[in-house]
Amino acid sequence: MAEPARALRVVRIYLDGAHGLGKTTTGRALAAASTAGEGVLFFPEPMAYWRTMFVTDALSGILAASARCAAASHGSARGAGGPAHRADADAAGLVAYYQARFAAPYLILHARVSALLAPPGPAPGGTVTLVFDRHPVAACLCYPFARYCLREINAEDLLMLAAAMPPEAPGANLVVCTLPPAEQQRRLAARARPGDRADAGFLVAVRNAYALLVNTCAFLRAGGAWRDGWDALEWADANALAALADPSCDECKMAPAPALRDTLFAALKCRELYPGGGAGLPAVHAWALDALAGRLAALEVFVLDVSAAPDACAAAVLDMRPAMQAACADGAAGATLATLARQFALEMAGEATAGPRGL
């Protein structure tokens, strides 16, 4: 009788950050580092889901909807003598729809993988590392937040998308990749991928979203609570949000010991979440912020400058593994995870990847 497969230690690494940094090449370099007993499985960006699995192309659709929002916003600003406070409702609805399309494959994959995981425990079967090209937080929070700063979606749209973030299984490690702005622009221009958005306002808004995400996770993991100090926060008005998407303004800094004012929550303290000018935040919005806080507090966050070559960046990520959280999976899950990685890579990116040895 065959001996049952032994339990595995599973390390999940989500490479994230603004687009055009080199996350995908770093992920592929990590997959190439797979060795017996220390397998690395790579789950690439789900480009096919966005571009070919539906009648409409999500990248083209969201670019068109964003342009419509920008046109409406500029018209409102001229009429009111200042920045528009809200996005055009119809165009914002389209942006939110396409943003949900971006989130869907990540949410589906996240649910599939999470079902195989358990809290950490003895794992005599060795370690497998799962490397994902982005976490659901990218499509559910960071990119919607950037669009919120640009008034392409409204606060209620952002909370709706953020509420879709799934509960986190044990062992989630988020590696936020960074680059100097000029190098990011150079890499974006060099890859020249159709559908890439490279306007300076959007890029700085996304970069700020990730800096605030790092601060928010650190604040929450240190025991911070958004409800403590919420009432004392200043209102995030249209000018404050516009500054987060203004290349001429200083970018947000990743603070060593962030306070509530250094987090995403501060930018969500806006009057549009208080219907009719009420004095209190509606309970349903507060519950959404509670849920968001719970999801983000579960993430172990690392920051990686990816200026170096992909192999060097991959080595730097592997050097972080001893400090990373892990989950456990039964021995049979190893083969299931390898199959998932092959299927996902083939369907989403047209890549036929082999599973690592030992799984």
UniProtKB/Swiss-Prot annotation:
The lineage of its organism: Viruses, Duplodnaviria, Heunggongvirae, Peploviricota, Herviviricetes. This is Thymidine kinase. It is an enzyme of class 2 (transferase). It comes from Bovine herpesvirus 1.2 (strain Q3932) (BoHV-1). ATP binds at residues 17-24, 187. SUPFAM superfamilies: P-loop containing nucleoside triphosphate hydrolases (SSF52540). Belongs to the herpesviridae thymidine kinase family. Homodimer. GO terms for biological process: DNA biosynthetic process; TMP biosynthetic process. It holds the Pfam family Herpes_TK. Catalyzes the transfer of the gamma-phospho group of ATP to thymidine to generate dTMP in the salvage pathway of pyrimidine synthesis. The dTMP serves as a substrate for DNA polymerase during viral DNA replication. Allows the virus to be reactivated and to grow in non-proliferative cells lacking a high concentration of phosphorylated nucleic acid precursors. It catalyses: thymidine + ATP = dTMP + ADP + H(+). The active site is at 45 (proton acceptor).
